[in-house]
Swiss-Prot record:
Subcellular localization, as worded in the UniProt entry: Cell inner membrane
One GO CC annotation: plasma membrane
Gene behind the chain: ansP
GO biological process: amino acid transport; transmembrane transport
Protein name: L-asparagine permease
Family (UniProt): Belongs to the amino acid-polyamine-organocation (APC) superfamily. Amino acid transporter (AAT) (TC 2.A.3.1) family.
Membrane topology: Multi-pass membrane protein
Keywords: Amino-acid transport, Cell inner membrane, Cell membrane, Membrane, Transmembrane, Transmembrane helix, Transport
Length: 499
């Protein structure tokens, strides 16, 4: 190795040490049991428990195929994130990786788009809580916004506790969700095998063929549905954020990621196939969990209510996770200058409380939306959440590609956990994410208006950058500099000036 190569390698190592310094203050308290369940629970939320009812109405049995396609690409994204985590675990997750491989402007865009995702997702979750509460007739007269505010208060308080307690609560939240799905799969399979009629219909595959087949509304509605189904997997990347507070991320994260793909297949695809073989797909309704519909049709007292409690837990779990992620992402951005400096503050419990409080303020807007337009909140904010998650996943893939390039050039150590089939699968995933945006444009009116809002989001991001660039320049002036590679005539890495 030449002296120039050695110097460049040392400079990259110094840069990573500077980035790792941003992790100071966190308490590495998460164990394998908690990380495993967080990864599983992150893939099971309101997108399955609440969203599946409306999706079955729109696409029928084809929803199973849509879940399978989205689940496969979600796995690719997780494997790409796994590469980055093994390279350098960080609570800032892909925002920190964007800072390392793409510069602070990219970290700024990645961070704020991810914040948009979780801000919108949180509004969806508190809306879901309110809808679930209205399942019980006794609460029918209570305004939707009251339940939304109550959920926000409970989960906001929970997130101010130390990470060990957050992880433990999230473990039990996730366990309840998993047990609920497993219970449905077992009961549904036994009932299907018994041949007993349900709600006046004999169960079986004929419920698909006799009700319009696999694509009852044609192929296009199923394709357009992809942009909504993406939201169902919008928490899977949380394992990357949690890696910064794991006891042993090098071992725990790969195990957690590899467990996700078959569970997506079982929980999502298996559940939908079973649902449409137990009842006609038209029996499921928007606004009510299809699992609640099934158990209610069984006629067993209180089963529907029990399942409704489970889906309430799922919504609270997702809201809890969102506050966890945004607090840490906003702190990472503040450390790089892309967010206000006060968001870098930590409590004595090692919690980035300032970022969490900032997110709670946004969630209050969601409560107000529940007061103004309670019937449309879920669909309105769902598309904006999808925009944020698509951007975030794209940054993960691009950073993974840049990491591979750095490894090939000897500027980073190789990792043992890799995305299979890369770079082909990397490019294929980016193409899939682009196609989701195109499909969203056909989802009139909400999806069309959301895509039309992209230029406005872009303008706001540009304005915001001009507001933070001076602080970014000040912070990055103290960062180690990687000099220009004169032989290759390209910039290997150089901290970005705020131009």
């Amino acid at each position: 190795m030449s002296k120039h190569d050695t110097d460049t390698s040392d400079q990259h190592a110094a840069k990573r040490r500077w980035l790792n310094a941003h992790e100071e203050g966190y308490h590495k308290a998460m164990g394998n049991r908690q990380v495993q369940m967080i990864a599983i629970g992150g893939a099971i939320g309101t997108g399955l428990f609440l969203g599946a009812g409306a999706r079955l109405q729109m696409a029928g049995p084809a929803l199973a195929l849509v879940y399978l396609i989205c689940g496969l690409f979600s796995f690719f994204i997780l494997r790409a994130l796994g590469e980055l985590v093994l390279h350098r675990p960080s609570s800032g997750s892909f925002v920190s990786y964007a800072r390392e491989f793409l510069g602070e402007k990219a970290a700024y865009v990645a961070g704020w788009m991810y914040f948009i995702n979780w801000a919108m997702t949180g509004i969806v979750d508190i809306t879901a809580v309110a809808l679930y509460m209205h399942y019980w007739g006794a609460f029918g007269g209570v305004p939707q916004w009251v339940f939304a505010l109550a959920a926000l208060t409970i989960v906001g308080t929970m997130n101010m506790i130390g990470v060990k307690w957050f992880a433990e609560m999230e473990f039990w939240f996730a366990l309840i969700k998993v047990l609920a799905i497993v219970t449905f799969l077992v009961v549904g399979t036994v009932f299907l095998g018994s041949g007993q009629p349900l709600d006046g219909n004999t169960t079986g595959f004929h419920l698909i063929t006799d009700n319009g087949g696999f694509f009852p509304h044609g192929l296009l509605p199923a394709l357009v549905l992809i942009q909504g189904v993406v939201f169902a997997f919008a928490s899977i990347e949380m394992v990357g954020t949690a890696a910064g507070e794991c006891k042993d991320p090098q071992t725990m994260v790969p195990k957690a990621i590899n467990s996700v793909i078959w569970r997506i297949g079982l929980f999502y695809v298996g559940s939908v196939v079973l649902l449409v073989m137990l009842l006609p797909w038209s029996a499921y309704q928007a606004g009510q969990s299809p699992f609640v519909t099934f158990f209610s049709k069984l006629g067993v007292p209180y089963i529907g209510s029990i399942m409704n409690i489970v889906v309430l837990t799922a919504a609270l779990s997702s809201l809890n996770s969102g506050l966890y992620c945004t607090g840490r992402i906003l702190r990472s951005m503040a450390m790089g200058g892309s967010a206000p400096s006060f968001m870098a503050k930590m409590s004595r419990q090692h919690v980035p409380y300032a970022g969490i409080l900032a997110t709670l303020v946004v969630y209050v807007v969601g409560v107000f939306l529940n007061y103004l337009v309670p019937s449309r909140v879920f669909e309105i904010v769902l598309n904006f959440a999808s925009l944020g998650i698509i951007a975030s996943w794209a940054f993960i893939i691009v950073c993974q590609m840049r990491l591979r390039k750095a490894i090939k050039e000897g500027k980073a150590a190789d990792v043992s956990f890799k995305l299979p089939g890369a770079p082909f699968t990397s490019w294929l995933t980016l193409l899939f994410l682009l196609s989701v945006l195109v499909l969203m444009a056909f989802d009139y009116p909400n999806g069309t208006y959301t895509i039309a809002a992209l230029p406005i989001i872009g303008i706001l991001l540009v304005i915001g950058w001009f507001g933070v660039r001076k602080r970014v320049a000040e912070i990055h002036s103290t960062a180690p500099v990687v000099e220009e590679d004169e032989e290759k005539q390209e910039i290997v890495f150089k901290p970005e000036t705020a131009s």
